[in-house]
Each structure stands twice: as structure tokens, then as C-alpha cells.
From Swiss-Prot:
It comes from Rattus norvegicus (Rat). GO terms for biological process: actin cytoskeleton organization; actin filament bundle assembly; actin filament bundle distribution; actin filament-based movement; actomyosin structure organization; adult heart development; aorta development; axon guidance. The gene is Myh10. The rodlike tail sequence is highly repetitive, showing cycles of a 28-residue repeat pattern composed of 4 heptapeptides, characteristic for alpha-helical coiled coils. Residues 1129-1155, 1698-1708 have a biased composition (Basic and acidic residues). Myosin is a hexameric protein that consists of 2 heavy chain subunits (MHC), 2 alkali light chain subunits (MLC) and 2 regulatory light chain subunits (MLC-2). Interacts with PLEKHG6. Interacts with ECPAS. Interacts with KIF26B. Interacts with LARP6. Interacts with MCC. Interacts with CFAP95. It is found in: Cell projection, Lamellipodium. One of its GO terms (molecular function) is calmodulin binding. This is Myosin-10.
Amino acid sequence: MAQRTGLEDPERYLFVDRAVIYNPATQADWTAKKLVWIPSERHGFEAASIKEERGDEVMVELAENGKKAMVNKDDIQKMNPPKFSKVEDMAELTCLNEASVLHNLKDRYYSGLIYTYSGLFCVVINPYKNLPIYSENIIEMYRGKKRHEKPPHIYAISESAYRCMLQDRKDQSILCTGESGAGKTENTKKVIQYLAHVASSHKGRKDHNIPGELERQLLQANPILESFGNAKTVKNDNSSRFGKFIRINFDVTGYIVGANIETYLLEKSRAVRQAKDERTFHIFYQLLSGAGEHLKSDLLLEGFNNYRFLSNGYIPIPGQQDKDNFQETMEAMHIMGFSHEEILSMLKVVSSVLQFGNISFKKERNTDQASMPENTVAQKLCHLLGMNVMEFTRAILTPRIKVGRDYVQKAQTKEQADFAVEALAKATYERLFRWLVHRINKALDRTKRQGTSFIGILDIAGFEIFELNSFEQLCINYTNEKLQQLFNHTMFILEQEEYQREGIEWNFIDFGLDLQPCIDLIERPANPPGVLALLDEECWFPKATDKTFVEKLVQEQGSHSKFQKPRQLKDKADFCIIHYAGKVDYKADEWLMKNMDPLNDNVATLLHQSSDRFVAELWKDVDRIVGLDQVTGMTETAFGSAYKTKKGMFRNVGQLYKESLTKLMATLRNTNPNFVRCIIPNHEKRAGKLDPHLVLDQLRCNGVLEGIRICRQGFPNRIVFQEFRQRYEILTPNAIPKGFMDGKQACERMIRALELDPNLYRIGQSKIFFRAGVLAHLEEERDLKITDIIIFFQAVCRGYLARKAFAKKQQQLSALKVLQRNCAAYLKLRHWQWWRVFTKVKPLLQVTRQEEELQAKDEELLKVKEKQTKVEGELEEMERKHQQLLEEKNILAEQLQAETELFAEAEEMRARLAAKKQELEEILHDLESRVEGEEERNQILQNEKKKMQAHIQDLEEQLDEEEGARQKLQLEKVTAEAKIKKMEEEVLLLEDQNSKFIKEKKLMEDRIAECSSQLAEEEEKAKNLAKIRNKQEVMISDLEERLKKEEKTRQELEKAKRKLDGETTDLQDQIAELQAQVDELKVQLTKKEEELQGALARGDDETLHKNNALKVARELQAQIAELQEDFESEKASRNKAEKQKRDLSEELEALKTELEDTLDTTAAQQELRTKREQEVAELKKALEDETKNHEAQIQDMRQRHATALEELSEQLEQAKRFKANLEKNKQGLETDNKELACEVKVLQQVKAESEHKRKKLDAQVQELHAKVSEGDRLRVELAEKANKLQNELDNVSTLLEEAEKKGMKFAKDAAGLESQLQDTQELLQEETRQKLNLSSRIRQLEEEKNSLQEQQEEEEEARKNLEKQVLALQSQLADTKKKVDDDLGTIEGLEEAKKKLLKDVEALSQRLEEKVLAYDKLEKTKNRLQQELDDLTVDLDHQRQIVSNLEKKQKKFDQLLAEEKGISARYAEERDRAEAEAREKETKALSLARALEEALEAKEEFERQNKQLRADMEDLMSSKDDVGKNVHELEKSKRALEQQVEEMRTQLEELEDELQATEDAKLRLEVNMQAMKAQFERDLQTRDEQNEEKKRLLLKQVRELEAELEDERKQRALAVASKKKMEIDLKDLEAQIEAANKARDEVIKQLRKLQAQMKDYQRELEEARASRDEIFAQSKESEKKLKSLEAEILQLQEELASSERARRHAEQERDELADEIANSASGKSALLDEKRRLEARIAQLEEELEEEQSNMELLNDRFRKTTLQVDTLNTELAAERSAAQKSDNARQQLERQNKELKAKLQELEGAVKSKFKATISALEAKIGQLEEQLEQEAKERAAANKLVRRTEKKLKEIFMQVEDERRHADQYKEQMEKANARMKQLKRQLEEAEEEATRANASRRKLQRELDDATEANEGLSREVSTLKNRLRRGGPISFSSSRSGRRQLHIEGASLELSDDDTESKTSDVNETQPPQSE
């Protein structure tokens, strides 16, 4: 930007004075102090200078007050040089960090510069004051300027978008985002102001009737929207409480032709309540302040304090008057074209909203019902809205609600009534706002001019992160996620498009996908559903609440990476989403209500039926709202009728918003977006104050830092070649030579001279691109260079000035000497008399000469005057002639221009006619193909009809057969039911016996159940721990110990059993049975233990095999890696051989050219010899004979040589192709060969062979080199010995023969190579076969391993089941001993110990949480360091580059300056020290990694011990005898655990110290640690999900089983009545068939009548076409005339072209002859005659050319005559058009007749039954096709008439088209009549057959299903009854099972039944109704 001093007032807020910034003193101060940024609580960041470094901390001195402080290195951020102060684009900053960005924005803001570029977008900070930078002068300053030509401004963004739209013809968008009060609305208005000024449609136009009306309306739309949609908040006095997208349409020329506004998320709740110190929408205050008395009385207005909805009364806005704003709003409405009635109706609705708030309800005494004690307010409200007061009161207090199929009056409570009134007020205002926007769009819509492009301006709130966020914040943040994704994608796309334009190598990166997980979390419809989908789903569920919604959300999305449970606000927030801008806690209160937005549909219906048309229009979509019955149905009924009737009739708020957002994003994606980020500087609304922390938060939320980061990942600094050369050529003084050089080449030379790293720059087509910081480095080098040059220049200037002063003094000294000498001489001569005489006489000598000189001058003056007059006359004559020639030239040019234009028009007409003809021919072909297709379809339908008739007959036969089978099945069903009843009776007897037995054991079972439940819980814990540990040995030892304990307890129980035998005989029998069962279980347990041991042994063998296999696999991988290296070397050698092969072929080609050169030299020598033969006559004949012989031999040898070379080249090409194929195969096999071990040997052999080949080829190349050198020697000898031609020719022949031999030899070599390549291919195939075999073997091993693992898991499950049975028996026997009472004390003691342990565990978990918080702190530090990671890497590269540059300079100047050696040594020492520090940090990082691993291992050990402790607790709970011992062990383990925790604490403290010290190295380790942690969490999560899934599946299976049982009951009840229904259905079918036949006959009759009417219409159409044909005949005559004229024109053009070709041919011959004359100097005398002849021929041709030109003029005259004839023909065509109009009238009459036909068909459709609707609709479709064809014909006719106006040759094609269409239309109508009849008959028959078939199939399937169910139930019950009888006889365990489902089982084992009487009866009924599967 140009430097400016003394800036004017507006420019002071736009431009920066760079002269102040480029201050050398400031630069030197910055360099000396090592300034950096350090964190500050007050200022965000403060400037400080580094004084001392102490390890990880740095001593700094604050620049502001000089205080010193210790700061961690990680908290320091680099500072940019002073020359980057107040930079206009922050992407240019070399050190890009939060501190630098904040400092730059702060400096510019304090200087009044509120606009700053940040990469590709613009950042705006609200100044909170008016700046003079928005005037028309500023607009004109930015108009037509590019972005970089002017300082940052919203006008620059608007201008860029406007110019891009005009140039690229692509729609544009400007996206303004930011917090409330940041200035989004104001910047939106400035954009509209700029576009309205720049693209005003009335500027430069002739129409001044309504100057700029559209632009005025566009500007006045904002005040209206602000009045109804803006409000005063704490942050902003004019806050937009809605988002809007303003779409401004432009025409092709860039003028505004219309606009459209779309709004989003109006905060309608503000209309009913406001926060403290806030206002509702402006219109309420404006209306109450500005309305006159008459208007107030009409609207029933009162004071501010009389309205409940104005929560805070009247709150004025500083600097604004609501009364004046009301007048401005009314004036804006008038400008927008609002009528007085519309304005009054709107204000009535506004007043009614206030009246809603004044309605008060009262709770009645004895009930909760609400009542309205005072209805005055209701009367006012109903008066304003046009409703009945009584109906309104009834609808509010006792609305009608649909329950089932009936409507009931439901009384409302006071809370429900208040809620309904507020909801109505909000809905009314929202609908008013929507109508207002629609009305403004209607006013801004213009249909006169078509808009081709548009610019959209988006004004929407940015990310909102409060302490607790609701549904509105979710919608806003969801929108911003989508916009940020669009920003990332678009920004980097633009950057990369420039790279592609400039031809830079670049890998495409899409940053838009980074935000996709969070977007999916919100909007995903299913699998799993997102937040909005779950909210919609929950809205439909009965008895759903916000709590159930949150539970579902956690269940579905709990594992999502962007979803978390709140940590800090656990009690307040429900869930947390990680947005782009940060973590946001959401509170889901009233989300269901907000999403449904329910209304009192009774009142809504009254509003819809209002007497006020405006109110009725607002509520016209009343059928799409959620009513009270909907909400009632959710809370009281389970999917009631209200749910069914209302579903699908409306969409929820979330769904509507998602759709509108999707539409908006689709619009924005199709545009070129321009981003404007608005920032609020403070919340006090004070000008000149900037809160650093607030701005930093907004920068993060707006993505400013992220955007710059994305921009800097590429090459953010770029400069055009010319500017780079001009600015930095000073650094490379001798790199560019003098003279002209292309800019790109010059820059490449400069870059090479600067010795830059190639990774730091890219050279494009017009610019050179640099990484961040490179230009800053070049600037520093340039400053140093300029400083040296200036110093040198000053020295030169001082020397020059000193020398010049010295020379001047010397000159003065010599002049003084001359003056002194002259003065001394004058003093001597002044008294001499002759001197006096001399001084007096000398002047007189010139007097006589002066007169002579004057006379000579006078004569000379007269001559000059005469010449001047003569020249002036000649000049006038020349000017007159020149003017005359110019006039003639202009006339000729105009004539020539007119003729060329006429010719071009004629040519264009011919091209258009040819294109039209082609189009008509294509249409004709399409029509013909359609006719053929219709015929084929008719034939297909005919065939289908025959097939369907045959199918109907088959179905009738099947129906008869199935009827007989059904009767048989009915008989079998009756017998089966009798058997089932008998079985049920037997089962009831058995159940009675079981119930008696169960009653006796009921008391005992209750206590058993309690203990078993406790043991089951402990067992579940043990099982989970066992799964985690996977230690089979520990589990086996536990089993052995438990078995021993069980044996002891069994012995004790036997003793107790003997005692109990004397007490109760019944119990003795039961205990004996239990004892027998225990013995059996013991035997089974021993067997299972043996099986478990075998399984464990097999598992050990399998693990051993697996380890061996893994070892073999690792060895194979190592071998494959070696093989890969050998293969790469082999590939390199092969490439080298290929290169040598190419070199060899090139040498052969060179040899061939050399041989041809030798032949050329021999030909030249032969010519010399012929010249000598002319001089020596005697030798002429002999030499001619010899030359002939030699020529024949040479020709023969050439042919042989050429053929040999061609064959050789073909063989080489074949070898290359074959080799290329082999290379492809080889590359395909490379990936597979990695797994094969034998490839090493094969490829080594191949390598040896290829090495051998390479050596062979090297030898061949050397031989060829030798032969080439020999050829060179022979060629030299041939040139020296010209007299020995014969010998030289012999040598050439021998050389050719040798070349042929070489070619043959090379062909043999190629064949050898080919065979070797074939061998290689065979070897590769063999290797692939071996690889496949090995892979199949590996798969077999894996399958065997999987099968063994499955067996092991099954055995483990069996073992666990045995453990459960053993534990159950143990608990039961313990209860029988009655020792439970004695053990209760110990159990309580154990529970207390357990509670203590749980407390200890909780304390440990708290400590772990503290450690987690410490880790979070470290993660924050890591995030801060991550932001500077890119800059650090860049700086590291920069430092390495500096070191390399210094090394190079050391080598250059080592011999010249001794001081440079010291400097280079110092730099080398610094480099070594830096490298040592880096190595030391790397070692620290490794030690840290080891320490972390040790900590993780200690943590795992702690977890294992914790789990062991829980296992010990379980053992304590299960074993009652060793209580004290276990407690002691628990205490010991507790102490050990606490000791380990203490050790872990110390270790973690050491780790924290080391982590704080080596934060840079820790970054890599934390990434790995996070990955491991995420993997562990994912594993746990998947395990939990699997458990939950199993649980859900079990519940689902239970529900399915219950549903199946219920269905079976229903089917059994309906089975008896099915036969009667089938018979009735058959009778109905027969009756329907008869009725259908009758209706079919009636339709056939009606169709015949229609066909007769169609024939009459066709006759009328033919008459109309006959009249049209007469018109076409007349037009054909005119076409013939045109054709003849066209033929003449074409003939003349051909003649002209032939003459032109002849002229060019003659000129070509002349040029060739001239060349021959010039070349043939020896035959000059013989060619002179030929030259004269040719000159005569040329003269003749020139005469002919002149004749052709005269003919051309005649042709032009004739062409003009033809144009006149064309004009006359056009007049004739005008007459023809009137005749064509008559034919159009006839066509319209036919269309009317067709419409009448359609009406008749509709009447027929109403008469025929519903089953024939499809047939009638098909007929309508056919008639519609005819109408479309007629309309198409009309369109083509109209297009043809338009083309006739322009050209004379279109009549023929149009008439031919009309004739073809007439003929085709006749054919189509005939075919359609036939097709209609066929289609009608076929469809009728098809429908009848399909209905009959479906009915028959349904009945057959139903009967078959019932039969199958009955047979299955019968057989299953019979089997179960038999098994039950057998088991009862044996006295063994009885199990009733539903084998059909396999999921519910009831085990009865002796005395261990666990069912009550009720349960037994229900189970019995379930068993009776369960059917086992029947195998068919």
C-alpha cells in the first residue's frame, strides 16, 4: 500500500502510515531486546524481553514497567518484527500465534482500523461509534478496485463478490457470523447499501419514471424487519433475534432485478417474557409510543405498565426515540407498497399479542379446574382477532379433545390455560412475522427482467456457549458446525485451486471432513440415530419425557467421540457435545414441548374461521399443528387414536429447521462464499476498549486461528515475478545477465543464487510461492544489504564531493593567478599611447562590415519567403488530395464492410437452416422409433393376455383342489382338538401334585432364593474378573477348594439329615432324593473336570502351536523383507539394463544416420566427378558406366540395409512390448510374493542372471562403440581420398554387410532375452502357486485354531454352569442345616469390611481422579504447545537453512577474512550445542516413555490386585468357616494396596516433574497414550454393548414368545369360523365377477361411442389440414425460387474459389521456378528462355486474375439483387403467416374438442366402479399424450414462424415437418384406437385375475398355516405328555419347555422347585399353549 502522510479524516480509519512503522530504530530495538509475548491475566499477553534462561524457565523483563518475572518456556510465544505491525492481512505474519493475532487486531482497533483480513476472509471488530468510512465517496473509492488495491473494508468484500459474479457468472454469498452485538446486522446493511449503489438499475437507463424504486425498497426492507425482529438485549441495543439470508438477484448486465429474504429461528418466546434490563421486539414500544389517539382507540391500546408481556415496562434506548422509529417504520411500509388495510391488520395482531398476556385465570376452590373471572380482556382480544368471546372462552377452559373415536370436553387447570395462552401469543406473532417476510419478498420480486445470478448475504448468530444451553443453542451451534465445515472446505479449495492454476505440485486435502462426526451426531437419521432424530422419535412415544430422551441419547450415542456426560455440571446439565468451538453442556428441559410446539387446536380453529380475513390468512394451515389431544395422547394412552390420526400431518420444529438448513447449505455450496467474522470487543458497549480474553474466545469460536493455520499449511506468501525481481535482485547482483530475460527465468536464477531450500518455495506460472517466514528472512537480508549499500554510497558521495571541492579550489587558484598576471600587464600598458589608440580604433572597424551583412540577410530573407509561399501551396494541394483519398478510402471500407456483413449473415442463415433440418430429421427418427416401440408393446401385451388367461384357468383348478384339501384338514383338526383336551386334563392332574409339593417347600425356598441371589451377584463379579484375567489355573484351583468344602459340608449335612429324619418323615424322603442328586452331580462334576483338564491341555497345545506359527510367520516376514530389498535392487538393475538397451538402440540409429551421411557424401563426390568428366572427355563414358554400376549396388545395399533395420526395430518393439507386459505381471505379483519364503532364492538367481545379461550388454555396447569409431575413421578416409571412389564404395558395402551381421546378432540377443523373460515368468507363476498353497495351509491352521477356541469356550461355559449348580446346592443344604441365623453375624461383619473396602476403593478412585485432572492439565499444556508446533518446525527448518548458508559462506570467505572463521566456528559450536540439546531431550523423552510404561504397568498391577481383592471378598462371602482368616488376608492386602498406591503417587509426582521439563518430547508419547486409552475404552465399551445387546435380545425374544402364544390363542379361536368365511368370500367373488362382466360390457359400449366421436373430429382435422396444404404449396414455389438463387450463388462461389486456387497454383509455380533459377547458376543460359516464358505466363495469369476480380464484382451485384428478392419473399411470407394463423385456430378448436373428450371420460370414470379407475386413467394418459403432441406441434410451428421472419429457407423444412407430423398423427390415432381397446380389455382381465388369484392364495395360505399349527401343536403336546409320564414313573427331574422358541424353560428337580401356585398355573397354561416344531 502506498505510503501516506497527512491523511484526511475518513482515510485515517482506513490507511496505515508505513513511514512510521518502517522505523530503523524500532527494528534495532526489537532485535537487541529479544522481545517475546508472555501470558497476562489483564492484557491477555504482554511484551517482554528475555534476560536469562534457567532450564525450563526463563527470566523476562516486562517492556511496560520493567518488572522481572520467571516464566515457563512453554508459555512464551514469539513476537513478529516491527515492520509487521498493523499488517492488513494476518496471514502475512511470520510468527502466527494467538498473541500475534491479538496484538495486531488490538493495534489496528486502537488506531481506528476495524477491518482486517485474515487469510481469505475479513475480521470486523465493533467500534461502538460512528466512523466516516461509509459515505458515497468511500463507495466510489472501492468501486471497480481489486481487493489488494485498497485497505480492508466490507465494501472490498462486496466489490470482490460483485465482480466475481459478473466475470465468472457464478453465484456469490457473503456470510456474516459472530456473537450478538458484534455488528453482523450493520455489516449486512452496508453490503446491501454498496450493492444498491453500485448495481442500481436506474443508472444509465432511459426510463426515469420510477427512479431506483427497487433499490429504495431493498434498503427499506431492513427497518421493517428490525422493528418486528430486533430487540434490546444486555449485549446489544438492536440485537437481531432471528437469522436471515438475503438473496439479491442481478441480470446479465449486473443490475439488480429483485431480491428474496429467508429467515431462521425467530426467538418468539421474547414476545411473552424478557430477561432483566431487556426489551421485547421494537414494534411493541414503537406502537405504544408513536400511535395517535385515533389509532390507539382502534387498537384498544393502553400504557406500558398495563401489559403483563412487557415484563420490565418501558426501557428506553439511548440515542433513539421509539416515536420517530415508528414513523420511519410506517414510511418504509408505504415505500414497500403496503396498503393501509394491511398495516392496520398487522398492528391489530401486534395489539392482540399484548392482550393475550393480560388474560388472567383463577383456580377454583374445590377442583383444579381453571376459570376466567373477568372476560373484559378476552372481549378486547376477540374484537381484535374477529372471534366469538364465548367460543374462545370455552376453547381455552374446556377444549374438545379426541379420545379414541369420540370427542370429550376436558377441563384445563390454571397452569395449562396459562401455557395455552402463551403458546397462542407466540404462535400468532411468529405467523405475523412469517407473513411480513413473505409480503416483503412479494414486493421485492420483479418478473420484468430475468435474474441470471445472485449474491446472498447470510446474517446469523455464531457459536453460543453459555453455562447451560437449551434447544435453541443446539440449533444455532448445529448451523455453525455446518458453516464452519463449508468455510474449511471452501477456503482450502480456493487455496489449492490457485496452486493448480499456477501448476504447482500439490496433494489435495479436504479439511471439511474434520467436523463431520459432530454433524453426524446431531443430524444422522439412523444407525445410530442422532440428537434430532431421537428427539423426533421421542415426541411420538407415549409417556415420553425429557429424561427418557436423555437416557435414550446416552444409550445410543454414549460411545460417540463427540458426545460426553457433563463433568463439572453433573447435577444441572444432561449431556455434553464437543463442538468445533469447544465443549457445550446442554440441559434438555422442555425439549419435547419446544420440538412439538403444541397449540390449543380449538382456538386455532377459531382463528382460522375468524371474520378478519388477515387473521384467517395467518392461520390457514391450522391442520398441520400439534393439538392438545396429541399431547394428551402422549401422556395418557399408548399409541392412541390421536397418534394415528395426527402422524404425518405435520413436522416437528427440529425437522423443519434441519430441512431449511439443508436447503441453505445446498444454496451456499452452489455459490462462491465470502466470509466476514464479526467480533464484539467488550460487553460494556464502550468505544476504544478491547477485552483480550473475550476476543480470543471469539477468535477460537469463529475459526480465525484455524483458518490461518489451514492457509499457512500451504504457501501463504506469494509474489509476482516482476515484483520479486524488482525487490530482491539486490541480493543477487550478478545472477541475471544484462538484456531482456523472462521473469520466470530471472526468478529461477535468483532462487539458485540465494541457495534456498526447495521445500520452502514453489515457482508457478505467474507468481513465486513461499512458506511462512521465508519472505521475512529475505526482507532482513535485503535490509542488511541496503544498509551496506547505503554506507558504501555515502562514502562514494563524500569522496566525490571532496574531490569536486578540491578541483574547484584548484581552478579558483589558477584563475586568481591569471587575473593577477593580467592586472599587472594592464597596469604596465595603461599609460602607453599606442594602447589608447588601439582601444579606440578597434571598435570602428566593424561598422562597414555590418551594412554588407544586413543587405545579405535581407536577400536571404526574401528567398526564404518565396520558398515558404511555394511550399505552403504545395502543402495545401497535398492536403486536399489526402483528404480526397481518405474520403474514397472510407467509402470503399464501408462498402466492403457492408458486403462482408451481408455475406456473414447469409452464411449464418445457411448454417442455422442446416441445423434446423438436422433437428427435424432427428425428431422424425424419434417418432418412427416410438411408433415401432408402441407396436412391440402392443404385441407383448397381447402375449401376456394369453398367458394370464391360461394362468386364470390353472388358478381355478388349484382353488377346487385346495377346497377339498381344506375340508379334509378341518376333519383332522377336530380329532386333534379332542386329543389335546385329553392331554390337558392329564397335565392338570400332574400340576396338582406338583403344587402340593411346592407349597410344602415354599418357606424354605424363600430363604434359599435370598442367599442364591447374593451368591449369584458375587458369582457374576467373579465371572467378569475371570474373563478379564483369563487365568485358567486360578479358576481350577478355586474349583478344587470349593469341592473340598462342599464334601465337608455334605458330610455335616448328612449328620444333620439323620437328626432331621426323626423330626419329619417327609423331609427324610426329600433329603434322600437330594443326596442322590448330589452324588450324580458329583460324578458329573468329576467328569467335567476331566474334560476341562483335557480342554486346557488342548488349549496349551494350541497356544504352543500358535506361538510356533507366529514365530514362523515372523521369520517369513523377515525373509520377505530381505527379498523385497533384493527385488528392489533387481528392479534397479533391470531399469539400468533397459536404459543401456535404449542407449544401444540410439547408437544403432546414429550408425544408420552416419551410413546415410556417407552415402550422401558419395553422391556429392559423384556430382564433382561428372563436372570433371565435362573437362576430360576421354574418361566420361567409362566413369558413367562405373557410376551406374555403383549406384545400382548402393541402391541394393540400401534396400537390404533398410529392410534389416526395419526387421530389427520390429523385433525390438516386440521385445519391449513383451517386456512391458512382463513388467505389469511382475508388479501385480510383487504384493503377493511378500508372503512367500522361497522367493529369496529365485530372485537371487534372477539377479545373477540379470547381472550376467548386463555384463553381456556392456560388452556389446563396447563392441558397438569400437565399430562406430571404425566407421568414423572410414568416413574420414573417404573424405580425404576422393579420387579412390571405387575402393570407398567397396568399404561401404563391407560396412553394410557388417551392420547386417550386427543386426542379426542383435536379433538373436533379443530372442535370447525373450526366452529368458519367459523363463522368469514361469518361475514367477511357480512362486505364485507355492504362495497360494502356503496361504491355503495358513487358512486351514486358522480354522483349526478357531474351532479349538470355540470348543474351549463351550467347555468353559459348561464348567461355569456346573459351578452355578454346585453353589445352588451348597446354599440349599446350608439353609437346611438352619445355620443361616448363626452366620448372619459373620455376614454383617463381612459386609462392614466390604463397606470399608469400598470406602478405600472410593478414596483410591478419588486419587485417581486427581491424577486424571493432572493429566488434563498436561493436555491443556500440550494443546498450547500444539498451536506453536508448526511455527517451531518452520523455525527449525529455518535455523538449519541458516546453518547451511553459514557453512557455505565459511567456505567462500575462509581465505579472505580471518574474522569470518571465528564467526563460522561460533555458529558451528551453537549448532553442536543445539544438536546436543536435541539429543538430550530425545533421551529424556525415551526415559519418560519408559517411566510412563512402568506407571501403566503399576496401574495394571493395581487393578489386578484390586480384582484379586474382590475375589477374596467373594471367597469370604461364600465360605463361612474361615471368616477371620479371610478378614486378616483382606486387611493385609489392603495395606499392601495402600503401599502400592503411595508408591504410585510418588511415581506420578516424579512423572509430572519430568513431563513439565520435557513437554516437547512428551507430545509424541501422549499421542500413543491417548490411542491406547481410546482402544481400551473402545474394548470396554464394545464389551458393555455386547452385554446390553444380549440383554435386549433376551427381552425381545421373551416378548416375541408371548406374542406368538397370544397369536396362537387367537388363531385357535378363529380356526372354527374360517370355513364359513371362506364360503361367504367365494360367493362374494362370484357375485363380483358377474358385476364386473356387466360393467365391462357397459364400458365397451361407451368406448365405441367415443371412437365414433373421435372419427368425426379426425375428419374435421383432415379438412383443416387440406387448407393448410394449399398454403404450403404456395410456399414451395417461393422455396424453388430461393433454391435457384442459392444454386447460382454457390456456382459463383465455386468459380471464385477455382480462380483463387489457379492463382495460388500459378504463384506457387512462379516461386518454385524462381528458386530453381537462383540455385542453378551453371544452367543460367538455358533457363533464360524458360524464365521469359514463365513471365509471360505470369502476366497472362495476372490478366486472368483481374478478369476474375471483375467477375467477382458482378457476382456481388447479383448477390445484392438476390437480397432484394429475399426481401420481397419475406413480404410474401408475411402473407403466408396469416394463413398459418388460420390453421392454428383450427388446431385450437381440435384441442377444445379433446378437452371435451377428456371431460366425458371423467364422467365415465365416475360412473364405472372403483376397480376400473386404472383403465380410465390409462385412457386419460393416452389422450394427454395426444394433447402434448398437439402442443409440441404448436410450439414447433411458432418457432418455425419466428425463424421464417429471419430467413427465407426455413419454409421447406417446416412444411415437410408438418406433412410428416400429419401423416404420423393419423397413424398414431389409428394405432391408439386399437391400443386403447386392447389395453382396456387386457387390464380388465388382468385385474380380475389378480384379485381372484390373491384371494385364493390368501385363503390357501391361511388354511395351510392353521393346519400346520394344529398338527405341530398336536404332535408336540403328545410328545411332551409321553415324556412327562415316563419321568413321573421314574421319579426323575421334569422339565416343561417351549421347544418352538427354545428360550423359556422350567426345571423341576426333586425338592428344588422355585415356583409359587400362581406361577405354576400360568406356566402350565403356557406349556399347554406351546407347540413344538413339526418337521415336514
